[in-house]
Amino acid sequence: MELDFGHFDERDKASRNMRGSRMNGLPSPTHSAHCSFYRTRTLQALSNEKKAKKVRFYRNGDRYFKGIVYAVSSDRFRSFDALLADLTRSLSDNINLLQGVRYIYTIDGSRKIGSMDELEEGESYVCSSDNFFKKVEYTKNVNPNWSVNVKTSANMKAPQSLASSNSAQARENKDFVRPKLVTIIRSGVKPRKAVRVLLNKKTAHSFEQVLTDITEAIKLETGVVKKLYTLDGKQVTCLHDFFGDDDVFIACGPEKFRYAQDDFSLDENECRVMKGNPSATAGPKASPTPQKTSAKSPGPMRRSKSPADSGNDQDANGTSSSQLSTPKSKQSPISTPTSPGSLRKHKDLYLPLSLDDSDSLGDSM
């Protein structure tokens, strides 16, 4: 006996066709609008969690610190304690953060931050070692356009204007620079060391560079030259001050400079260095005295002149006038005025006469 199951096959076929049409024509639950919205919201939340927040941190009580920008994210810092530890390595010093970063405050100190979720994009915060906020104007030393919310066009224009201003300033600075020989006197107990420094467009590029050259030349006992003063007591603050009417400057180190009248007054030796021949007084060595030069020079000078001329010349202060008119006098072929020995003697003789014997020259004329 055979059973006929044809009607069951037709019913199963119909049900299979209905399921197939439902799968092909109608969207599955995973592709529904609700699931698509849920998946998009989850991705946005995940991206917001992964996105780093750029914030700036300051030291508590440090008004000269410009702050440090951090990119805070959950991938970089697994916990708030990890952020505190990293800030300790970056900001810890021996003055303001002795015990590291233990607390984070808002920039006005009104609220204490307890987790990374409380940090907001583009805001500034203060790191502290103790539970005490020091109210200081932290943001006064920072460019207000540092925030990431500022448009890129503004950021691109700022460096261009800064570069153009710097180039214009550099061109302006080069206009007043001219060859000039200045005298630098070391501050302190007299006798003081004095050196001469040549300033021109090749040696005077900036005020800091000139201070470095003066430091190497003057060699202060306290180290680096920090301040320069004119003889009137005015402090030199820029490169332009070197090319004014003043030629003499007092170099001071890190020590506190005392404004005493004796510090700005020059003694006889320092005046001799100033009024002497620049080529002969380029270093700290003192010029020879008139007595020593007059004692060494009369011998060869008398042999080069006739007795009648030598008797008429020795009339003023025991100094022979032949020393002043040597190029005009008739010399023997042995000692010519163009020989190196005679030029060296003339340089030594002319230097003190321009300082001490000005009266005698006026009488002899």
Swiss-Prot record:
<dbReference type="GO" id="GO:0048675">
    <property type="term" value="P:axon extension"/>
</dbReference>
<feature type="modified residue" description="Phosphoserine; by CK2">
    <location>
        <position position="90"/>
    </location>
</feature>
<keyword id="KW-0493">Microtubule</keyword>
<feature type="modified residue" description="Phosphothreonine; by PKC and MAPK">
    <location>
        <position position="326"/>
    </location>
</feature>
<feature type="modified residue" description="Phosphoserine; by CK2">
    <location>
        <position position="306"/>
    </location>
</feature>
<feature type="region of interest" description="Disordered">
    <location>
        <begin position="275"/>
        <end position="365"/>
    </location>
</feature>
<dbReference type="GO" id="GO:0150052">
    <property type="term" value="P:regulation of postsynapse assembly"/>
</dbReference>
<dbReference type="GO" id="GO:0098982">
    <property type="term" value="C:GABA-ergic synapse"/>
</dbReference>
<keyword id="KW-0963">Cytoplasm</keyword>
<feature type="compositionally biased region" description="Acidic residues">
    <location>
        <begin position="356"/>
        <end position="365"/>
    </location>
</feature>
<dbReference type="GO" id="GO:0021952">
    <property type="term" value="P:central nervous system projection neuron axonogenesis"/>
</dbReference>
<feature type="modified residue" description="Phosphoserine; by CDK5">
    <location>
        <position position="287"/>
    </location>
</feature>
<dbReference type="GO" id="GO:0048672">
    <property type="term" value="P:positive regulation of collateral sprouting"/>
</dbReference>
<feature type="modified residue" description="Phosphoserine; by PKC">
    <location>
        <position position="294"/>
    </location>
</feature>
<dbReference type="GO" id="GO:0030426">
    <property type="term" value="C:growth cone"/>
</dbReference>
<feature type="modified residue" description="Phosphoserine; by CK2">
    <location>
        <position position="360"/>
    </location>
</feature>
<dbReference type="GO" id="GO:0021860">
    <property type="term" value="P:pyramidal neuron development"/>
</dbReference>
<feature type="modified residue" description="Phosphoserine; by MAPK">
    <location>
        <position position="332"/>
    </location>
</feature>
<dbReference type="GO" id="GO:0005737">
    <property type="term" value="C:cytoplasm"/>
</dbReference>
<dbReference type="GO" id="GO:0019901">
    <property type="term" value="F:protein kinase binding"/>
</dbReference>
<keyword id="KW-0217">Developmental protein</keyword>
<dbReference type="GO" id="GO:0045807">
    <property type="term" value="P:positive regulation of endocytosis"/>
</dbReference>
<feature type="modified residue" description="Phosphoserine; by CK2">
    <location>
        <position position="265"/>
    </location>
</feature>
<dbReference type="GO" id="GO:0030425">
    <property type="term" value="C:dendrite"/>
</dbReference>
<dbReference type="GO" id="GO:0048813">
    <property type="term" value="P:dendrite morphogenesis"/>
</dbReference>
<keyword id="KW-0597">Phosphoprotein</keyword>
<dbReference type="GO" id="GO:0043005">
    <property type="term" value="C:neuron projection"/>
</dbReference>
<dbReference type="GO" id="GO:0098793">
    <property type="term" value="C:presynapse"/>
</dbReference>
<protein>
    <recommendedName>
        <fullName>Neuronal migration protein doublecortin</fullName>
    </recommendedName>
</protein>
<dbReference type="InterPro" id="IPR017302">
    <property type="entry name" value="DCX_chordates"/>
</dbReference>
<feature type="modified residue" description="Phosphoserine; by CK2, MARK1 and PKA">
    <location>
        <position position="115"/>
    </location>
</feature>
<dbReference type="InterPro" id="IPR036572">
    <property type="entry name" value="Doublecortin_dom_sf"/>
</dbReference>
<feature type="domain" description="Doublecortin 1">
    <location>
        <begin position="53"/>
        <end position="139"/>
    </location>
</feature>
<dbReference type="GO" id="GO:0098978">
    <property type="term" value="C:glutamatergic synapse"/>
</dbReference>
<feature type="modified residue" description="Phosphoserine; by CDK5">
    <location>
        <position position="297"/>
    </location>
</feature>
<feature type="modified residue" description="Phosphoserine; by CDK5">
    <location>
        <position position="339"/>
    </location>
</feature>
<dbReference type="GO" id="GO:0008017">
    <property type="term" value="F:microtubule binding"/>
</dbReference>
<dbReference type="GO" id="GO:0060041">
    <property type="term" value="P:retina development in camera-type eye"/>
</dbReference>
<keyword id="KW-0677">Repeat</keyword>
<keyword id="KW-0221">Differentiation</keyword>
<feature type="modified residue" description="Phosphotyrosine; by ABL">
    <location>
        <position position="70"/>
    </location>
</feature>
<dbReference type="GO" id="GO:0005874">
    <property type="term" value="C:microtubule"/>
</dbReference>
